[in-house]
C-alpha cells in the first residue's frame, strides 16, 4: 500500500479581484449608510429594510475581500490550512445578525399597521433611486473586464443583483405614497424586502454551518464520484473512506483507493490526482493506495459523511 499527498496551487489574478471587491464594497457600504440615515429622516421602514438587504451585500463583499487577503497568508505550524476558515466564521455571525435585524424590521412593520406614521415620500424616492444606481454601479464594477474571476467575486455579484429587487421595492412604496398618500405601502413593502433578506441570511447560515461542521460541498455527489473513478480509471477497483470538506472556498479530500498493483506507482497516483482536479476541481488530495480488498467493517462506514478523520491500514 502507499500513502501519498498532493497540493497543487492555482494562480488567479488576486490583485484585480481584490480591487473590484474593494471598489464595490466602498460603493455599497456608503449607500447602505445613506439609506439608514434616509430611512430614519423620512420615516420609511422600506428604506431601512433595503439597507438591511444592502448589509447582506456589504458583508458578502467584505468576506470575499477577506478571503482574497487571507488566501495569501501562508499556513503556519499552528494553522496548517492558513486562515481561510475565518471568513466562514464571520459569515455565520453575519447571518445570525441579519436574522435578528429582519425580525426587528418585521415587528416594527406590524406596529406601523396599528399606528401609522407619516412618511416623507419625496426624500424616500430620491434615496431609493440613489440606492438602485449604487447597486447597478457595484454590479458593473464586479462584472466588467476580465472574465477570470474567482468564486467569491461571482457570488458577490449575484448578491448585488439580488439587492436590486429591494431598491425597486422601496421605489414602488415611495411612488404609492407620493401619488396616493397611502402610508401602509411602506410597511407592506418593508416586509416583502425583509423576506428577501431572510432568504439570503438563511442561505448564508446554512452554507456557513455546513462548512463549520466540515460537511461536503453541496454540489459534490460522493457516490457518483466513487462510481466514476472505478469506471473511468482502469486500474481502480474500489474507492472507500472518502472524506471531503471545505477550507474557505477550496475543497479538501482524503480517500483510500484499491488498485491493481501498477508498473509505475507514481504515474497512477498522478493520474488519480489529475482526474480529481480536472473533473471535480479538488486541488488538495491525500490518497492512500491499497493493493488488497478492504473487508473490515469500517471500510464502508460513514461513506456519506464528510470529515477529515480517517483510518490507515
Swiss-Prot record:
GO terms for molecular function: zinc ion transmembrane transporter activity. Residues 1-20, 69-89, 143-159, 203-313 are cytoplasmic. Its main location: membrane. Residues 42-47, 111-121, 181 are periplasmic. It comes from the Bacteria. The keyword Isomerase does not apply. It is found in: Cell inner membrane. It is a multi-pass membrane protein. Keywords: Cell inner membrane, Cell membrane, Ion transport, Membrane, Transmembrane, Transmembrane helix, Transport, Zinc, Zinc transport. The keyword Translocase does not apply. One of its GO terms (cellular component) is plasma membrane. InterPro entries: Cation_efflux (IPR002524), Cation_efflux_CTD_sf (IPR036837), Cation_efflux_TMD_sf (IPR027469), CDF/SLC30A (IPR050681), Zn_transptr_ZitB (IPR023500). The chain crosses the membrane at residues 21-41, 48-68, 90-110, 122-142, 160-180, 182-202. Involved in zinc efflux across the cytoplasmic membrane, thus reducing zinc accumulation in the cytoplasm and rendering bacteria more resistant to zinc. It may contribute to zinc homeostasis at low concentrations of zinc. Belongs to the cation diffusion facilitator (CDF) transporter (TC 2.A.4) family. SLC30A subfamily. NCBIfam families: CDF (TIGR01297), PRK03557.1 (NF002923). This is Zinc transporter ZitB.
Amino acid at each position: 500500500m502507499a500513502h501519498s499527498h498532493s497540493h497543487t496551487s492555482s494562480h488567479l489574478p488576486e490583485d484585480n479581484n481584490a480591487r473590484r471587491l474593494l471598489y464595490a464594497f466602498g460603493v455599497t457600504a456608503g449607500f447602505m449608510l445613506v439609506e439608514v440615515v434616509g430611512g430614519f429622516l423620512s420615516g420609511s421602514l422600506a428604506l431601512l429594510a433595503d439597507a438591511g438587504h444592502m448589509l447582506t451585500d456589504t458583508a458578502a463583499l467584505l468576506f470575499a475581500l477577506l478571503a482574497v487577503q487571507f488566501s495569501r497568508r501562508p499556513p503556519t505550524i499552528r494553522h496548517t490550512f492558513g486562515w481561510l476558515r475565518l471568513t466562514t466564521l464571520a459569515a455565520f455571525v453575519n447571518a445570525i445578525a441579519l436574522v435578528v435585524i429582519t425580525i426587528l424590521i418585521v415587528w416594527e412593520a406590524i406596529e406601523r399597521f396599528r399606528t401609522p406614521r407619516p412618511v416623507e415620500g419625496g426624500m424616500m424616492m430620491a434615496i431609493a433611486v440613489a440606492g438602485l444606481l449604487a447597486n447597478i454601479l457595484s454590479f458593473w464594477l464586479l462584472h466588467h473586464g476580465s472574465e477570470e474571476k474567482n468564486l467569491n467575486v461571482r457570488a458577490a455579484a449575484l448578491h448585488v443583483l439580488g439587492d436590486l429587487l429591494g431598491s425597486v421595492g422601496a421605489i414602488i412604496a415611495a411612488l404609492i405614497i407620493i401619488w396616493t398618500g397611502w402610508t401602509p405601502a411602506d410597511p407592506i413593502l418593508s416586509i416583502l424586502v425583509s423576506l428577501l433578506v431572510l432568504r439570503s441570511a438563511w442561505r448564508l447560515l446554512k452554507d456557513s454551518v455546513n462548512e463549520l461542521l466540515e460537511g461536503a460541498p453541496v454540489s459534490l455527489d460522493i457516490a457518483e464520484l466513487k462510481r466514476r473513478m472505478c469506471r473511468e480509471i482502469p486500474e481502480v477497483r474500489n474507492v472507500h473512506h472518502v472524506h471531503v470538506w471545505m477550507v474557505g472556498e477550496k475543497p479538501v479530500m482524503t480517500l483510500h483507493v484499491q488498485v491493481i498493483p501498477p508498473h509505475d506507482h507514481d504515474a497512477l497516483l498522478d493520474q488519480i490526482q489529475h482526474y480529481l482536479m480536472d473533473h471535480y476541481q479538488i486541488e488538495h488530495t491525500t490518497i492512500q493506495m491499497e493493493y488488497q480488498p478492504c473487508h473490515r467493517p469500517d471500510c464502508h462506514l460513514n461513506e456519506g459523511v464528510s470529515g477529515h478523520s480517517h483510518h490507515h491500514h
